[in-house]
A protein has these predicted regions:
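Generic structural signal for well-ordered alpha-helices
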Residues: 34, 62, 87, 126, ...
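Accessory C-terminal segments flanking Radical SAM cores
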Residues: 175-248
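Conserved alpha-helical substructure of the radical SAM core
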Residues: 1-73
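Glycine-rich beta-strand-to-loop/alpha-helix junction loops that act as flexible
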Residues: 47-51, 77-79, 249
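Conserved radical SAM core fold
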Residues: 15-16, 52-54, 80-85, 101-117, ...
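Conserved C-terminal portion of the radical SAM core fold
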Residues: 40-46, 67-75, 96-97, 102, ...
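Aromatic/hydrophobic pocket-lining residues that form the small-molecule binding cavity
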Residues: 30, 58, 83, 122, ...
Length: 249
Protein backbone atom coordinates (compact mmCIF):
# COMPACT_ATOMS: atom_id res chain seq x y z
CA UNK A 1 0.00 0.00 0.00
CA UNK A 2 1.31 3.46 -0.89
CA UNK A 3 -0.14 6.96 -0.77
CA UNK A 4 1.95 8.27 -3.70
CA UNK A 5 1.35 7.85 -7.43
CA UNK A 6 4.89 7.55 -8.78
CA UNK A 7 4.87 7.20 -12.56
CA UNK A 8 7.21 4.18 -12.55
CA UNK A 9 5.43 2.26 -9.79
CA UNK A 10 1.74 3.04 -9.11
CA UNK A 11 0.77 5.78 -11.59
CA UNK A 12 -2.94 5.32 -10.77
CA UNK A 13 -2.32 5.00 -7.05
CA UNK A 14 -2.92 1.97 -4.85
CA UNK A 15 -6.17 0.17 -5.61
CA UNK A 16 -7.36 -2.77 -3.56
CA UNK A 17 -8.16 -5.88 -5.55
CA UNK A 18 -11.72 -6.82 -4.52
CA UNK A 19 -11.02 -10.45 -5.36
CA UNK A 20 -8.00 -10.67 -3.02
CA UNK A 21 -9.30 -11.70 0.39
CA UNK A 22 -5.88 -12.11 2.02
CA UNK A 23 -5.24 -9.97 5.09
CA UNK A 24 -2.11 -8.09 6.05
CA UNK A 25 0.03 -9.44 8.88
CA UNK A 26 -1.13 -8.35 12.32
CA UNK A 27 1.06 -6.61 14.89
CA UNK A 28 1.22 -9.86 16.89
CA UNK A 29 2.31 -11.86 13.84
CA UNK A 30 5.04 -9.35 12.99
CA UNK A 31 6.25 -9.33 16.59
CA UNK A 32 6.42 -13.13 16.69
CA UNK A 33 8.23 -13.22 13.35
CA UNK A 34 10.74 -10.61 14.51
CA UNK A 35 11.64 -12.68 17.57
CA UNK A 36 12.05 -15.79 15.41
CA UNK A 37 14.34 -13.96 12.98
CA UNK A 38 16.35 -12.66 15.91
CA UNK A 39 16.84 -16.20 17.24
CA UNK A 40 18.00 -17.30 13.78
CA UNK A 41 20.76 -14.68 13.79
CA UNK A 42 19.26 -12.05 11.49
CA UNK A 43 21.19 -8.82 12.10
CA UNK A 44 19.09 -6.27 10.22
CA UNK A 45 15.45 -5.64 9.35
CA UNK A 46 14.30 -3.09 6.79
CA UNK A 47 10.69 -1.94 6.89
CA UNK A 48 9.55 -1.06 3.41
CA UNK A 49 6.46 -1.20 1.23
CA UNK A 50 4.66 0.44 -0.49
CA UNK A 51 4.90 3.06 2.22
CA UNK A 52 5.36 1.57 5.70
CA UNK A 53 4.09 4.63 7.58
CA UNK A 54 0.55 4.24 6.19
CA UNK A 55 0.05 1.49 8.78
CA UNK A 56 -1.62 2.99 11.84
CA UNK A 57 0.47 0.74 14.08
CA UNK A 58 3.77 1.50 12.32
CA UNK A 59 5.42 3.09 15.36
CA UNK A 60 4.22 0.26 17.60
CA UNK A 61 5.88 -2.21 15.23
CA UNK A 62 9.09 -0.19 15.13
CA UNK A 63 9.29 0.16 18.92
CA UNK A 64 8.56 -3.55 19.40
CA UNK A 65 11.37 -4.50 17.03
CA UNK A 66 13.82 -2.27 18.90
CA UNK A 67 12.76 -3.17 22.42
CA UNK A 68 11.72 -6.83 22.26
CA UNK A 69 14.24 -8.45 19.93
CA UNK A 70 18.00 -8.69 19.60
CA UNK A 71 18.03 -7.37 16.02
CA UNK A 72 20.96 -4.88 16.00
CA UNK A 73 19.65 -2.70 13.16
CA UNK A 74 16.13 -1.70 12.19
CA UNK A 75 15.88 0.61 9.18
CA UNK A 76 13.18 1.75 6.79
CA UNK A 77 12.58 2.86 3.21
CA UNK A 78 10.02 5.64 2.84
CA UNK A 79 8.62 8.10 0.32
CA UNK A 80 9.11 10.77 2.98
CA UNK A 81 5.41 11.55 3.42
CA UNK A 82 5.10 13.98 6.37
CA UNK A 83 8.73 13.31 7.31
CA UNK A 84 8.94 16.77 8.87
CA UNK A 85 6.14 15.78 11.27
CA UNK A 86 7.34 12.29 12.21
CA UNK A 87 11.13 12.76 12.27
CA UNK A 88 11.21 13.14 16.06
CA UNK A 89 9.06 10.02 16.53
CA UNK A 90 11.35 7.98 14.28
CA UNK A 91 14.35 9.08 16.31
CA UNK A 92 12.67 8.42 19.65
CA UNK A 93 11.53 4.96 18.52
CA UNK A 94 15.16 4.00 17.91
CA UNK A 95 15.24 3.77 14.12
CA UNK A 96 18.80 3.02 12.99
CA UNK A 97 18.66 4.15 9.36
CA UNK A 98 16.37 5.66 6.76
CA UNK A 99 16.23 5.54 2.95
CA UNK A 100 14.15 8.33 1.41
CA UNK A 101 12.93 8.40 -2.19
CA UNK A 102 13.63 11.72 -3.93
CA UNK A 103 13.69 11.38 -7.71
CA UNK A 104 14.15 15.10 -8.33
CA UNK A 105 15.17 18.18 -6.36
CA UNK A 106 12.96 20.29 -8.60
CA UNK A 107 9.63 20.91 -6.89
CA UNK A 108 7.48 20.76 -10.03
CA UNK A 109 9.24 17.66 -11.38
CA UNK A 110 8.85 15.93 -8.01
CA UNK A 111 5.15 16.79 -7.97
CA UNK A 112 4.69 15.48 -11.50
CA UNK A 113 6.47 12.20 -10.70
CA UNK A 114 4.75 11.45 -7.40
CA UNK A 115 1.40 13.22 -7.58
CA UNK A 116 2.30 15.13 -4.39
CA UNK A 117 3.74 18.60 -3.80
CA UNK A 118 5.70 17.53 -0.72
CA UNK A 119 9.38 17.93 -1.60
CA UNK A 120 9.75 20.80 0.88
CA UNK A 121 8.36 18.62 3.70
CA UNK A 122 10.89 15.88 2.95
CA UNK A 123 13.85 18.26 2.85
CA UNK A 124 12.69 19.86 6.10
CA UNK A 125 12.36 16.39 7.64
CA UNK A 126 15.93 15.54 6.64
CA UNK A 127 17.16 18.72 8.35
CA UNK A 128 15.27 17.78 11.52
CA UNK A 129 16.84 14.31 11.52
CA UNK A 130 20.28 15.85 11.11
CA UNK A 131 19.67 18.22 14.03
CA UNK A 132 18.80 15.13 16.08
CA UNK A 133 22.22 13.72 15.11
CA UNK A 134 20.59 10.94 13.08
CA UNK A 135 23.54 9.63 11.09
CA UNK A 136 22.37 6.96 8.65
CA UNK A 137 20.43 8.92 6.02
CA UNK A 138 20.25 7.73 2.43
CA UNK A 139 18.39 9.17 -0.55
CA UNK A 140 17.28 7.00 -3.47
CA UNK A 141 16.32 8.15 -6.96
CA UNK A 142 15.20 6.06 -9.92
CA UNK A 143 17.26 7.00 -12.98
CA UNK A 144 14.79 8.23 -15.62
CA UNK A 145 15.28 9.48 -19.16
CA UNK A 146 14.93 13.25 -19.67
CA UNK A 147 14.15 13.73 -15.98
CA UNK A 148 17.31 13.22 -13.94
CA UNK A 149 19.81 11.66 -16.36
CA UNK A 150 21.93 14.67 -17.39
CA UNK A 151 25.25 15.94 -15.99
CA UNK A 152 23.38 19.06 -14.85
CA UNK A 153 20.94 16.97 -12.80
CA UNK A 154 23.77 14.86 -11.39
CA UNK A 155 25.49 18.08 -10.34
CA UNK A 156 22.37 19.27 -8.49
CA UNK A 157 22.36 16.09 -6.43
CA UNK A 158 26.10 16.51 -5.95
CA UNK A 159 25.57 19.99 -4.55
CA UNK A 160 22.96 18.53 -2.21
CA UNK A 161 25.45 16.09 -0.66
CA UNK A 162 28.52 18.31 -0.88
CA UNK A 163 28.06 19.57 2.68
CA UNK A 164 25.54 16.94 3.78
CA UNK A 165 26.68 13.60 5.17
CA UNK A 166 24.09 11.74 3.11
CA UNK A 167 24.42 8.76 0.76
CA UNK A 168 22.67 9.49 -2.53
CA UNK A 169 22.04 6.46 -4.77
CA UNK A 170 20.66 6.18 -8.27
CA UNK A 171 18.66 3.02 -8.99
CA UNK A 172 18.47 1.80 -12.56
CA UNK A 173 14.87 1.31 -13.69
CA UNK A 174 13.93 -2.38 -13.83
CA UNK A 175 11.58 -3.99 -16.32
CA UNK A 176 8.63 -5.82 -14.78
CA UNK A 177 5.71 -7.67 -16.28
CA UNK A 178 3.39 -4.68 -16.32
CA UNK A 179 5.68 -1.75 -17.18
CA UNK A 180 7.21 -2.74 -20.53
CA UNK A 181 6.06 0.39 -22.39
CA UNK A 182 7.18 2.66 -19.55
CA UNK A 183 10.52 0.86 -19.38
CA UNK A 184 11.16 1.27 -23.11
CA UNK A 185 10.35 4.97 -22.93
CA UNK A 186 12.16 5.90 -19.72
CA UNK A 187 14.98 3.42 -19.09
CA UNK A 188 18.51 4.79 -18.88
CA UNK A 189 21.50 2.49 -18.52
CA UNK A 190 23.31 2.96 -15.21
CA UNK A 191 26.58 3.33 -17.11
CA UNK A 192 25.73 6.96 -17.89
CA UNK A 193 25.92 7.85 -14.19
CA UNK A 194 28.96 5.68 -13.55
CA UNK A 195 30.79 7.40 -16.42
CA UNK A 196 29.90 10.79 -14.91
CA UNK A 197 31.32 9.74 -11.53
CA UNK A 198 34.56 8.45 -13.03
CA UNK A 199 34.97 11.58 -15.14
CA UNK A 200 34.57 13.76 -12.05
CA UNK A 201 37.07 11.77 -9.95
CA UNK A 202 34.68 9.91 -7.65
CA UNK A 203 36.45 6.87 -6.20
CA UNK A 204 34.74 3.43 -5.80
CA UNK A 205 34.42 2.27 -2.20
CA UNK A 206 34.10 -1.29 -0.91
CA UNK A 207 31.74 -2.31 1.89
CA UNK A 208 31.09 -5.32 4.08
CA UNK A 209 28.75 -8.22 3.39
CA UNK A 210 25.68 -6.52 4.88
CA UNK A 211 25.99 -3.33 2.83
CA UNK A 212 23.62 -4.33 0.04
CA UNK A 213 23.89 -4.09 -3.75
CA UNK A 214 24.92 -0.43 -4.03
CA UNK A 215 28.28 0.41 -5.60
CA UNK A 216 29.41 3.44 -3.62
CA UNK A 217 31.71 6.32 -4.51
CA UNK A 218 33.53 8.90 -2.38
CA UNK A 219 35.15 12.24 -3.18
CA UNK A 220 37.55 14.28 -1.05
CA UNK A 221 35.55 17.47 -1.65
CA UNK A 222 32.21 16.00 -0.55
CA UNK A 223 30.85 15.00 2.86
CA UNK A 224 28.22 12.76 1.27
CA UNK A 225 28.60 9.75 -1.00
CA UNK A 226 27.16 8.74 -4.34
CA UNK A 227 25.90 5.23 -4.97
CA UNK A 228 24.65 3.22 -7.91
CA UNK A 229 22.28 0.25 -7.81
CA UNK A 230 22.48 -1.47 -11.18
CA UNK A 231 20.22 -4.56 -11.34
CA UNK A 232 21.49 -5.48 -14.81
CA UNK A 233 25.15 -5.58 -13.77
CA UNK A 234 27.03 -8.87 -13.81
CA UNK A 235 27.38 -9.42 -10.06
CA UNK A 236 24.16 -7.81 -8.79
CA UNK A 237 22.80 -10.95 -7.09
CA UNK A 238 26.12 -12.65 -6.38
CA UNK A 239 26.33 -11.89 -2.65
CA UNK A 240 22.63 -11.51 -1.87
CA UNK A 241 21.83 -12.57 1.70
CA UNK A 242 18.36 -11.03 1.99
CA UNK A 243 15.02 -12.60 2.84
CA UNK A 244 11.99 -10.62 1.64
CA UNK A 245 8.76 -11.09 3.57
CA UNK A 246 5.61 -9.58 2.08
CA UNK A 247 3.02 -7.60 4.03
CA UNK A 248 0.81 -10.67 3.95
CA UNK A 249 3.52 -12.96 5.24
Amino acid sequence: VCNYKCSYCLPQGYKKNPGDMRSFMSFEEISRLTKALSELGVCKIRLTGGEPTVRKDFFDILKDMKQNSNIPKVTMTTNGYQLNKIANQLHEAGLDGINISIDSLNRETFKKLTGHDRLHEILEGIKILQKLNFKNIKVNAVLLKDINDTPEEFEKFGNFIKNNKIDFRFIELMQTGDNLDYFKKNHVASKIFKDYLEKNKWIPQTYGKDAGPSLNFIHTDYKGKFGLIAPYSKNFCQTCNRLRITSRG
